[in-house]
């Protein structure tokens, strides 16, 4: 069975900060995002150009052979989710770290453990969130372990890799752009939320569209807002004005490092 490890545990598009559980293991009282966590790559919305049969990730899965990649995209587009499900799809051990919270000691431990698993024929997918936060020397530290196959690296970044990552690291990894989720993809997330809750959101059709528009392509934000709406009882569905009054207005520009 595939082994999963987090050093430390990290958030993703559909989950909080705990290691991923299978849908059957998620409690009915868990946050909405956890209960909507995809179980397969095919369930990830909005990135079909990458995960579909003709996409780079889809082709890797079909071939059963995964190369190191850098996932570049805005927040809330499913970078961590995609990496975790990619490991599942090709049968790799999944380890996730964050460049914000991890240092040299953490990396040494990850690589040492990956070598031990490699000796028994178990390969490791190492997911590095916010990989651009590692300095140049730390980025260089990945090279020998990527080159000898100790780990297959999947890095995630919201920043342009050409400016933030070493040329040597980029030459050993394929950069894949993940798109901001469009209206149909976000609407599909709300459909799933309504299905799992067993009731529609307390919104008029126009307010539902306004909620989708307010997410600005961020699926994580949308699900959090939906959960907020489900936590309150309303006498009647909210119209756009009522929705705007209820929810805090979304900040137009996020901290680029969130």
Predicted regions and their residues:
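Conserved C-terminal helix/linker of AAA+ ATPases
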Residues: 230-254
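Conserved catalytic/switch belt of AAA+ P-loop NTPases
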Residues: 62, 132-171
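A short helix-turn-beta junction within AAA+ P-loop NTPase domains corresponding to the substrate/partner-engaging
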Residues: 92, 166-180
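Walker A/P-loop
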Residues: 11-25, 59-97, 112-115, 143-144, ...
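C-terminal helical "lid" of AAA+/P-loop NTPase domains
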Residues: 209-214, 220-234
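Conserved AAA+ ATPase "SRH/arginine-finger" region at the nucleotide-binding site
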Residues: 98, 174-187
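Short glycine-rich substrate-engagement loop in P-loop NTPases that contacts/grips substrate
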Residues: 52-54, 93-125
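Pre-Walker A (pre-P-loop) alpha-helix and adjacent loop at the N terminus of AAA/AAA+ ATPase modules
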Residues: 26-69
């Amino acid at each position: 069975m595939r082994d999963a490890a987090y050093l430390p545990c990290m958030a993703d598009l559909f989950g909080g900060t705990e290691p991923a559980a299978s849908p059957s293991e998620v409690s009915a009282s868990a946050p909405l995002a956890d209960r909507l966590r995809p179980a397969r790559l095919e369930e990830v919305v909005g990135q079909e150009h990458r995960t579909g049969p003709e996409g780079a990730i889809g082709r890797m899965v079909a071939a059963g052979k995964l190369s190191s990649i850098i996932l570049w995209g805005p927040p809330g587009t499913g970078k961590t989710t995609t990496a975790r499900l990619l490991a599942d799809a090709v049968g790799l051990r999944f380890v996730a770290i964050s460049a914000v919270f991890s240092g040299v000691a953490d990396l040494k431990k990850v690589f040492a453990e990956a070598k031990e698993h490699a000796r028994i024929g178990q390969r490791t997918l190492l997911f590095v969130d916010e990989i651009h936060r590692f300095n140049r020397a730390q980025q260089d530290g990945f090279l020998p372990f990527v080159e000898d196959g100790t780990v297959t690296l999947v890095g995630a970044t919201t920043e342009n890799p050409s400016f933030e990552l070493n040329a040597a690291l980029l030459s050993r990894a394929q950069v894949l752009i993940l798109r901001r989720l469009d209206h149909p993809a976000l609407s599909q997330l709300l459909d799933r939320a309504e299905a799992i809750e067993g009731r529609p959101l307390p919104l008029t059709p126009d307010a539902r569209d306004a909620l989708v528009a307010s997410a600005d392509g961020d699926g994580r934000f949308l699900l959090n807002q939906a959960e907020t709406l489900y936590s309150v009882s309303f006498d009647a569905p909210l119209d756009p004005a009522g929705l705007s009054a209820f929810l805090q207005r979304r900040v137009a520009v996020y901290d680029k490092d969130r």
